[in-house]
C-alpha cells in the first residue's frame, strides 16, 4: 500500500521500520519539527525524523496542518492510508479524509480507557493490571474512533513506563502490519460509552513523592514516571529521582529509611528504592548510588526535606 507515516518520538520508530520491512511504499513521513535540545540548545531532529532520513524517505515537519496549502500537499501524496502513532498534532477533517482508507491510529491503551496523551504512564500509576494496543480509525474526537484491532497484555508488577513503552511499541508495529494486510476484512467496532477515562499529560508537579500514602501508590508513581519526568524527593536541598522500586516489608515512622537497602516506610507498608539519580548525574543502581551519597538507616526523608 501507499502509506503516509505520521509519528514523532522513539515509540513510533519501530512502527515505521515494520511498515518498510513489510514492503509498503512510504509516500512521506510527517513528524514534529526539530527542537532545541542539549546544552548547546541546537535544533535536534526527532527520532522519527532521524530514522526516516536514514531510510532515505521524504520527511515533512509542518508546524501545523490547519492551512489549506499543507492540506493540499498532504492530499497530493495520493495515499491509500495514513498510519499515525504519537504524532503530536491535531489532524483536521480534510487530512483525515484525504487517504483512500483514511487515517489509522496506533493507541497504547485498551480504549475507551486512557484516551489522551499519556496512556502508558496513567495505566501504571492507576494500578491497572492489563493494558494493550488499539488500532483505531481516526475521527475528529480525541481517540474516539472505532477500533479495528485490539490486543491485550499484562502489566508486570515491577514494570516501568520505559519497559512497557518498548513492549507496546513493538506490539503496535506488528499489529499495524497485520491490520493493513487484512484491512478490507476488519470490522470497525464503535467504542463503548461506558468506561471512558482520560490520560492527561504528565505534569512535573505531580512527580514529587508523598511518603504518607500507601506503599503501593508510591511504587506505582515511581514506576509510572520512570524514566520521565522521574518521581522525586529532596534531601538537604538536593532533588533525588527514583527510577525503580519494589514493594518491601517494614514498618516505621512515615518517610523513615528502615535499612541499608533504602527501604522507606510509607503511610502503610514500605518501598525499596532500587535505582536513583542526582541532578546532573547519570542514573545509578542503589549500591553504586550509596557509595557517593549517604542515606543512612534512621534518616527521615520528611525531616531531611524540611531541613533545607
UniProtKB/Swiss-Prot annotation:
SUPFAM superfamilies xrefs: FMT C-terminal domain-like, Formyltransferase
Gene Ontology MF term list: methionyl-tRNA formyltransferase activity
Signal peptide: none
Pfam families, per the entry: Formyl_trans_C, Formyl_trans_N
Residues that hold (6S)-5,6,7,8-tetrahydrofolate according to the record: 109-112
Entry keyword Protein biosynthesis: yes
Source taxon at top rank: Bacteria
Catalytic activity: L-methionyl-tRNA(fMet) + (6R)-10-formyltetrahydrofolate = N-formyl-L-methionyl-tRNA(fMet) + (6S)-5,6,7,8-tetrahydrofolate + H(+)
EC numbers, comma separated: 2.1.2.9
Gene3D superfamilies, A to Z: 3.40.50.12230
HAMAP family: Formyl_trans
Family membership: Belongs to the Fmt family.
Function text: Attaches a formyl group to the free amino group of methionyl-tRNA(fMet). The formyl group appears to play a dual role in the initiator identity of N-formylmethionyl-tRNA by promoting its recognition by IF2 and preventing the misappropriation of this tRNA by the elongation apparatus.
Protein name: Methionyl-tRNA formyltransferase
Organism expressing this protein natively: Ruegeria sp. (strain TM1040) (Silicibacter sp.)
Amino acid at each position: 500500500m501507499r502509506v503516509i507515516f505520521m509519528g514523532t518520538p522513539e515509540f513510533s520508530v519501530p512502527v515505521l521500520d515494520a511498515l518498510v520491512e513489510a514492503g509498503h511504499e512510504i509516500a512521506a513521513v510527517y513528524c514534529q519539527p526539530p527542537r532545541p535540545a542539549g546544552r548547546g540548545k541546537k535544533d535536534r531532529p526527532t527520532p522519527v525524523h532521524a530514522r526516516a532520513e536514514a531510510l532515505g524517505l521524504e520527511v515533512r515537519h509542518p508546524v501545523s496542518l490547519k492551512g489549506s496549502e499543507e492540506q493540499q500537499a498532504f492530499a497530493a501524496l495520493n495515499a491509500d492510508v495514513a498510519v499515525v502513532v504519537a504524532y503530536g498534532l491535531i489532524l483536521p477533517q480534510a487530512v483525515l479524509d484525504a487517504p483512500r482508507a483514511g487515517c489509522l491510529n496506533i493507541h497504547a491503551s485498551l480504549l475507551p480507557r486512557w484516551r489522551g496523551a499519556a496512556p502508558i504512564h496513567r495505566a501504571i500509576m492507576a494500578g491497572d493490571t492489563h493494558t494493550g494496543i488499539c488500532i483505531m480509525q481516526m475521527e475528529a474526537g480525541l481517540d474516539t474512533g472505532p477500533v479495528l484491532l485490539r490486543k491485550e497484555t499484562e502489566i508486570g508488577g515491577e514494570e516501568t513506563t520505559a519497559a512497557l513503552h518498548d513492549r507496546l511499541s513493538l506490539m503496535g508495529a506488528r499489529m499495524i502490519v497485520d491490520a493493513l494486510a487484512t484491512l478490507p476484512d476488519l470490522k470497525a467496532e464503535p467504542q463503548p460509552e461506558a468506561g471512558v477515562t482520560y490520560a492527561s499529560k504528565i505534569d512535573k508537579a505531580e512527580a514529587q513523592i508523598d511518603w504518607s500514602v500507601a506503599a503501593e501508590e508510591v511504587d506505582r508513581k515511581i514506576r509510572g514516571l520512570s524514566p520521565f519526568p522521574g518521581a522525586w524527593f529532596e534531601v538537604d536541598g538536593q532533588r533525588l529521582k527514583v527510577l525503580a522500586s519494589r514493594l518491601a516489608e517494614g514498618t516505621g515512622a512515615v518517610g523513615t529509611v528502615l535499612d541499608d537497602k533504602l527501604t522507606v516506610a510509607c503511610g502503610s507498608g514500605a518501598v525499596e528504592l532500587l535505582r536513583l539519580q542526582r541532578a546532573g548525574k547519570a542514573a545509578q543502581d542503589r549500591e553504586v548510588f550509596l557509595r557517593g551519597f549517604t542515606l543512612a538507616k534512621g534518616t527521615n526523608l520528611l525531616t531531611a526535606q524540611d531541613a533545607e
